[in-house]
């Protein structure tokens, strides 16, 4: 059985350029910074966290991490970048500096308008200072780690596993699906992935239920899962998150 998505998602997916990661997902130190950024329609980040390979950035999404925003964590707001500038931290007057040098270089992104996501993206597993994704994933992800998927293959397989695992076959029976040269088998409490009949990796169904994205990485074993230019994306963390030095 082949992994098939709804027709509207198929149409969007066909137009995605997976090499284009032009959405900056940034974190926040506190609620005051969130308010200042929303009111002033801007976001700022240490220049060291954005490499030349990460440019250009066309959108910014605000990740309210569980540690800083308990009870209201996730991505609720995003916006298109109107213009950007390399500035000194001391020039960002909307948010008073509490540490570091006022001469430290920062990128300041002016946002056309902050827009609410129709369905907020909920945190699960992943923690990072910043990450880069694409607009398709931002508009379709249910959980934060899904923003880190790096190809159409990964997206299709991950969503199909999310759909099937809750209804995994009882002991002694099996089910599965395929996409191009990838075959996934659910049997005997485990998930196994094969490419061209060669085993890639496996994980338990229970581990996928508890930590789906970490388990998904195991299915790819020695094969690179996250495909993007520049430094690799952060590894998934299970229990905590980090905020940037903003």
Residue ranges and their predicted role:
Residues 192-194:
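Short, hydrophobic beta-strand segments that form beta-sheet elements in well-ordered domains
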Residues 18-180, 185-189, 198-204, 210-246:
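Structured alpha/beta reader/binder surfaces that contact nucleic acids or chromatin modification marks
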Residues 1-11:
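Acidic metal-coordinating catalytic centers involved in nucleic-acid phosphodiester chemistry
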Residues 10-20:
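N-terminal "first-domain core" detector
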């Amino acid at each position: 059985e082949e992994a098939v998505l709804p027709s509207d998602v198929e149409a969007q997916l066909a137009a995605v350029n997976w090499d284009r990661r032009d959405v900056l997902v940034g974190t926040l130190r506190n609620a005051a910074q969130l308010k200042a950024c929303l009111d002033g329609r801007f976001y700022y980040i240490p220049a060291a966290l954005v490499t030349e390979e990460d440019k250009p950035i066309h959108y910014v999404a605000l990740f309210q991490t569980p540690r800083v925003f308990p009870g209201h964590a996730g991505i609720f707001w995003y916006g298109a970048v109107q213009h950007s500038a390399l500035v000194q931290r001391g020039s960002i007057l909307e948010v008073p500096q509490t540490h570091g040098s006022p001469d430290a270089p920062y990128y300041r992104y002016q946002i056309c308008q902050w827009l609410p996501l129709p369905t907020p993206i909920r945190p699960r597993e992943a923690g990072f200072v910043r990450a880069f994704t694409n607009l398709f994933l931002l508009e379709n992800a249910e959980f934060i780690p899904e923003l880190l998927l790096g190809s159409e293959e990964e997206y299709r397989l991950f969503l199909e596993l999310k759909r099937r695992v809750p209804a995994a076959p009882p002991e002694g029976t099996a089910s599965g699906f395929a996409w191009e040269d990838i075959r996934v088998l659910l049997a005997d409490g485990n998930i196994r992935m094969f490419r061209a009949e060669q085993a890639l990796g496996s994980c338990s169904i229970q581990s996928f239920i508890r930590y789906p994205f970490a388990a998904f990485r195991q299915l790819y074993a020695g094969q690179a899962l996250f495909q993007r230019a520049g430094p690799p994306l952060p590894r998934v963390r299970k229990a905590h998150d980090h905020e940037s030095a903003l």
